[in-house]
């Protein structure tokens, strides 16, 4: 993991804060904090900032210069708030920037059946990685990872954190330990996917190794950044992205496969005769959501494509959470 050398007037506090974070929090949380705080440090160094308290104007100027998308602003603010709380616990006077009210305008990209077929075919024919590479099995890892995300609706972090001990390949069940909500759950797999995982584990030779990651990376598991980079290569080859997209807008990504799973699972349950009020609780538990409100966020698709289904889900959630006169 890359070591950042902080240079601003808060360099010592930043260094000790990151040492605390790496010892206390998950690796991905640490990486995000490290990235955001180092950006903040560079900006403060650039403007020769040297005051004890950082006001809102300086924070806003930093966010504007970095070009943080609206949907990501509160993530950056959260890191700064945690850092300032850390300094406050050391007896220092700080300013805590408030979270900003943002509109969630993000609509996920829903891959068509033809696009999914192309993605799978391209992933299966992915060029073999150089055997001397630090990650020699990337070509096979991506083919399996993509199917796991789409077929089981896993979050990317959940899939990448899987180890052999979390898989029951005899019964076709995955045990999710590293969840967003810190809740464990069991995820059943289709027999076809289970057999693919068996073959994959044999080919990359992770059977018999002391508790290996399902998707080995350079040091631990395959990193989310590497996985997304490889997926974008596949999407470009499939003609789904062209390479000239706005860098500040979210393009199709691996997380879109979880949205695809949610929509197609909902459609299958509806086709099988399950009404929305029966199907939604099952999907909510299966996907590890804390509430049906969280599941509703995954039903944000283009209304032109799925207008009827959007109305069904909206009617259901309105009956669950009626308006209350205050």
Identify the meaning behind each predicted range.
Residues 1-326:
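Conserved catalytic core of the tyrosine transesterase superfamily
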């Amino acid at each position: 993991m890359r070591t950042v050398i902080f240079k601003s007037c808060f360099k010592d506090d930043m260094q000790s804060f990151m040492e605390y974070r790496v010892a206390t929090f998950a690796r991905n949380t640490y990486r995000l904090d490290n990235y955001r705080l180092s950006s903040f440090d560079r900006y403060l160094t650039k403007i020769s900032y040297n005051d004890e308290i950082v006001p809102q104007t300086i924070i806003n100027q930093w966010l504007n210069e970095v070009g943080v998308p609206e949907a990501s602003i509160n993530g950056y603010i959260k890191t700064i708030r945690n850092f300032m709380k850390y300094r406050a616990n050391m007896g220092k006077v700080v300013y805590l920037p408030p979270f900003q009210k943002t509109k969630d305008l993000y609509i996920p990209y829903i891959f068509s059946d033809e696009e999914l077929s192309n993605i799978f075919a391209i992933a299966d024919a992915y060029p073999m990685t150089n055997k001397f590479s630090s990650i020699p099995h990337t070509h096979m890892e991506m083919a399996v990872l993509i199917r796991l995300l789409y077929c089981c609706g896993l979050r990317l972090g959940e899939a990448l954190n899987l180890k052999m001990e979390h898989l029951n390949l005899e019964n076709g069940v995955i045990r999710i330990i590293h969840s967003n909500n810190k809740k464990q759950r069991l995820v059943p797999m289709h027999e076809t996917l289970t057999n693919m995982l068996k073959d994959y584990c044999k080919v990359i030779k992770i059977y018999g190794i002391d508790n290996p990651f399902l998707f080995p990376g350079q040091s631990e598991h395959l990193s989310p950044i590497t996985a997304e980079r490889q997926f974008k290569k596949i999407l470009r080859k499939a003609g789904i992205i062209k390479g000239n997209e706005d860098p500040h807008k979210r393009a199709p990504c691996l997380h879109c496969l979880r949205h695809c799973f949610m929509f197609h699972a909902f459609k299958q349950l509806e086709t099988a005769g399950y009404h929305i009020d029966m199907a939604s609780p099952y999907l909510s538990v299966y996907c590890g959501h804390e509430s049906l409100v969280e599941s509703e966020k995954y039903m944000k698709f283009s209304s032109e494509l799925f207008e009827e289904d959007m109305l069904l889900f909206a009617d259901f959630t309105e009956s669950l959470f009626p308006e209350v006169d205050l």
